[in-house]
């Protein structure tokens, strides 16, 4: 025992200050690299790498989780409803107010050099186009067969070329000989029906202005309306005709909706409202396009608040899916009744009136549904062009809503002031939003990951609830700073730090030496001698 202690003391005495400098410097470097990796992993995936490895891999090895236990199966059965709800809330929806690629998105790229749409977003749009604009019988018509391939094409120029090719095929005239007299014949010219989906693609992607897009959509409307009427008469003749009629219906609804949006962009708002109302009456079951959200935005532009309230009364129902447009428009109407006279100082003195309480509750309801919107309405975060798809309750939906509705909030005097004074009070009602909500289901945890796929990389995705730094990042940062400080002090004051290091090690081993001395005093010397030899 005494030999071991003396050899340890000799080893410590032979260590030079350079050794301590090298030791602390190496420790600081390693902990710094770990810190950088942990921070990068946390920013990209939202969790600590060390914590994830510990929970996912080390804990099962240490026996912390029993995968075969009955408790696990019971808990999984009990959580099935919440899991299904989480999956439904993380569904990606088509943005009803999406912009035009050629006339709006591409112009932004030409000016800034940035791509406003992600590959994931455009791929979802390609899938939507194949679902809405194609059917199994397209191979029977050459133009539709070309367009079926065009919707799958990734290269924009290749898609545009395919659309022109489809239109050129339809320009081919079939000539039929009709004998009039034995010595002469004439040719009857017969035009093939136009390809409506080709005009749609050109209007969306090739037209560089809204006016050009509107002209192409009007040509698409002529072709699409004819195809719709023909397939409507034949839809009961078999499943193939029924699928073709369903496709033609989707094409016609899409064209009319985009024409209404063109009219809205060009300032013909009343005309746009009429087109949207007619479309909703003609096709009341096609709720997938969410045309009522386009109608709400146009009515707000006209300041027709009574009509807005009538639309909300129909669609702001407990049985229907909610959206930021529904919730925040309802809050705007409630705020409009009191916002011009609202004062935080007066409200704190006399309390809130019934109308003010209703407005505050409507704002809290809207903020609970989508907590990202107020930062854009209050211009605490800069807006970008909205994506073609949104995630309800996510940052993408907040951008899409604020991009079109910020002007409507500014137009109502005092509405933004009321929002500024009350929106943060929502979070006091739901301290644990991922576990339990107040008026809605708990906030889905999948929004951040999906929004990072939908939104461009130059945009900083808004995260809710704000994540705290994991313990391992804080621990690594402290360890890195501490070892770096030790290395610096050892380099500047080598002799003094050597004395401190020896004193620290002596203090560290003092309890062990005390225990060993007690053991030596209790055990016989002969037995202790035998144990040390072993």
UniProtKB/Swiss-Prot annotation:
Offer a single GO CC term for the protein: membrane
What are the Low complexity biased-composition ranges? 66-80
Where in the cell? Answer: Membrane
Chain positions covered by the region annotation Disordered: 66-85
Q: What Pfam families does the record tag this protein with?
A: ST7
The record's annotation in CDD domains points to: ST7
For this UniProt record, give its keywords in alphabetical order, as a comma-separated list.
Membrane, Phosphoprotein, Transmembrane, Transmembrane helix
Residues bearing the modification Phosphoserine: 343
Q: Membrane-spanning regions, if any?
A: 19-39, 469-489, 496-516
The record's principal subcellular location, in a coarse class, is: membrane
Q: Which InterPro entries match?
A: ST7
> Topology relative to the membrane, per the entry?
Multi-pass membrane protein
Family of the protein in this entry: Belongs to the ST7 family.
Q: What is this protein called?
A: Suppressor of tumorigenicity 7 protein
Q: Which organism is it from?
A: Macaca fascicularis
Q: What is the lineage of its organism?
A: Eukaryota, Metazoa, Chordata, Craniata, Vertebrata
């Amino acid at each position: 025992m005494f030999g071991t202690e003396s050899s340890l003391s000799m080893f410590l005495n032979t260590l030079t200050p350079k050794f301590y400098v090298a030791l602390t410097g190496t420790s600081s470097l390693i902990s710094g690299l770990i810190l950088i990796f942990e921070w990068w992993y946390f920013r990209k995936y939202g969790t600590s790498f060390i914590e994830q490895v510990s929970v996912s891999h080390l804990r099962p090895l240490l026996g912390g989780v029993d995968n075969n236990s009955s408790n696990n199966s019971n808990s999984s059965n009990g959580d099935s409803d919440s899991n299904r709800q989480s999956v439904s809330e993380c569904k990606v929806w088509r943005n009803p107010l999406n912009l035009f690629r050629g006339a709006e998105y591409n112009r932004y790229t030409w000016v800034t050099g940035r791509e406003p749409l992600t590959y994931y977003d455009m791929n979802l749009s390609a899938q939507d186009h194949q679902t809405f604009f194609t059917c199994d019988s397209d191979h029977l018509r050459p133009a539709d067969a070309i367009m079926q391939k065009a919707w799958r094409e990734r290269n924009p120029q290749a898609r545009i070329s395919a659309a022109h090719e489809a239109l050129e095929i339809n320009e081919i005239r079939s000539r039929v000989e009709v004998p009039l007299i034995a010595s002469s014949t004439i040719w009857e010219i017969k035009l093939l029906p136009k390809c409506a989906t080709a005009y749609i693609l050109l209007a969306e992607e090739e037209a560089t202005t809204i006016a050009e897009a509107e002209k192409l959509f009007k040509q698409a409307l002529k072709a699409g309306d004819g195809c719709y009427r023909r397939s409507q008469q034949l839809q009961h003749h078999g499943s193939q005709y029924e699928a073709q009629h369903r496709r033609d219906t989707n094409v016609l609804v899409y064209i009319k909706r985009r024409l209404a949006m063109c009219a809205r962009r060009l300032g013909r708002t009343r005309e746009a409202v009429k087109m949207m109302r007619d479309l909703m009456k003609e096709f009341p079951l096609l709720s997938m396009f969410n045309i009522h959200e386009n109608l709400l935005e146009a009515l707000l532009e006209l300041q027709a608040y009574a009509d807005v309230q009538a639309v909300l009364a129909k669609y702001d129902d407990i049985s229907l899916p909610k959206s930021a447009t529904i919730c925040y428009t309802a809050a705007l109407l409630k705020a409009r009744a009191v916002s011009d006279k609202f004062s935080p100082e007066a409200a704190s003195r006399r309390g809130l009136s019934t109308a003010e309480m209703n407005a505050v509750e409507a704002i809290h309801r809207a903020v609970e549904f989508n907590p990202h919107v107020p930062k854009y309405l209050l211009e605490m975060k800069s807006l970008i062009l909205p994506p073609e798809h949104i995630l309800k309750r996510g940052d993408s939906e907040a951008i899409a809503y604020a991009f079109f509705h910020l002007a409507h909030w500014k137009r109502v005097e005092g509405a933004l002031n009321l929002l500024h004074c009350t929106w943060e009070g929502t979070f006091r009602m739901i301290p644990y939003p991922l576990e339990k909500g107040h008026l809605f289901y708990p906030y889905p945890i999948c929004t951040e990951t999906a929004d990072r796929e939908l939104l461009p990389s130059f945009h900083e995705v808004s995260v809710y609830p704000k994540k705290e730094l994991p313990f391992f990042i804080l621990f690594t940062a402290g360890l890195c700073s501490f070892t770096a400080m030790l290395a610096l002090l050892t380099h500047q004051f080598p002799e003094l730090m050597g004395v401190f290091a020896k004193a620290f090690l002596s203090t560290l081993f003092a309890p062990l030496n005390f225990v060993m001395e007690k053991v030596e005093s209790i055990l016989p010397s002969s037995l202790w001698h035998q144990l040390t030899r072993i």
